[in-house]
């Protein structure tokens, strides 16, 4: 068998990636060493730089290398709309639609009482301060449609409802391209309720 | 959206891993930055060290940090048996069985004429020299049971058959734990032929 030490260390390190077990990690390690050493070094540098330089935007909490992220600084953005998402990945999905031109607030988590994650841990105070800065007129709740995401949206709407803001939630409904026959009943029920 | 630059560079670098597309790469990057920065730095170091230090054993061509790997140097190994495998991952699978105590020769590839990979590219000359060193008495062909693996085994057996060595191939047969009803016919036919 190939020597232990640095190969094993690499396999163990790759296993820390989400969704990567020991088999995938071995395959990745062997691939990089056998076919793509420049790729291994590029990944090494990229990890180092990102872990060193990435921090949170002071306004929206997303990842950025500057104090304030490019989205928050963009003057073409509609500052009267604030879209609340759980993670930068969710924000990125919304951005890729090209259908939203307001600003964001990234919670970097969600309420999850079972895991001991309460309102303080996801910085709801910061969100409430931001939403009540006088510029924001509409808060769009775009947390996920999971139990935790719904609970998070509920707590935020409770916290903001007396502040004179317009509070909206992403529409629940039938996914584009799908056939009713195969859509789950809860989704169809919501699509009926929210028909327009 | 989160700033480009070092986050995007990281996502692109992660995409060079086998089996990782842009969605998985984003998830990995966000996970490391959000929840496991020590993991990101550990992976960065492990990649750097492995890419710098890993080279091929002079005797068996597997990955090692020394000139000659620990397996080749182990005096308890039976040097009269030489098992030919395609990759260190295959070698590792054989080692984990605990059923083999001979030495290895790792081709680091397989014949693949369609990809322009011929006998010279996978170092068959080195294998032939090694097999005819006077110590080796049996060569066990453990290349994969794919078209390329079978072709590789065939070429090796042709090259070695006049040298007075015992040439064997891993048995083809019904996998342990499986039911005949669900095993493919080619495998059952081989299991019949190779019955003992």
UniProtKB/Swiss-Prot annotation, chains A, B:
PROSITE patterns: TOPRIM (PS50880). A zinc finger (C4-type) spans 57-72. GO terms for molecular function: DNA binding; zinc ion binding. Residues 80-175 form the Toprim domain. It comes from the Bacteria. GO terms for biological process: DNA recombination; DNA repair. CDD domains: TOPRIM_recR. SUPFAM superfamilies: Recombination protein RecR. Belongs to the RecR family. May play a role in DNA repair. It seems to be involved in an RecBC-independent recombinational process of DNA repair. It may act with RecF and RecO. This is Recombination protein RecR. The lineage of its organism: Bacteria, Pseudomonadati, Pseudomonadota, Betaproteobacteria, Burkholderiales.
């Amino acid at each position: 068998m190939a020597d232990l030490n640095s190969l094993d260390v690499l396999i163990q390190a790759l296993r820390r990636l989400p969704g990567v077990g020991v088999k995938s990690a071995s395959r990745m390690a062997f691939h990089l060493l056998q076919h793509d050493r420049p790729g291994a070094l590029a990944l090494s540098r990229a990890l180092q730089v990102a872990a060193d330089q990435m921090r949170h935007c002071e306004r929206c909490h997303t990842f950025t290398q500057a104090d304030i992220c490019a989205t928050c600084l963009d003057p073409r953005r509609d500052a009267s709309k604030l879209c609340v998402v759980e993670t930068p990945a969710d924000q990125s999905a919304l951005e890729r639609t090209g259908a939203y031109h307001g600003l964001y607030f990234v919670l970097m988590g969600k309420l999850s009482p079972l895991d001991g994650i309460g309102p303080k841990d996801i910085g709801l105070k910061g969100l409430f301060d931001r939403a009540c800065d006088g510029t924001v007129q509409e808060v769009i709740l775009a947390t996920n449609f999971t139990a935790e995401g719904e609970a998070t949206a509920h707590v935020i709407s409770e916290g903001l409802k007396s502040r004179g803001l317009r509070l909206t939630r992403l529409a629940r409904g039938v996914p584009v391209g799908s056939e009713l026959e195969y859509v789950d009943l809860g989704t169809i029920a919501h699509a009926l309720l929210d028909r327009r």
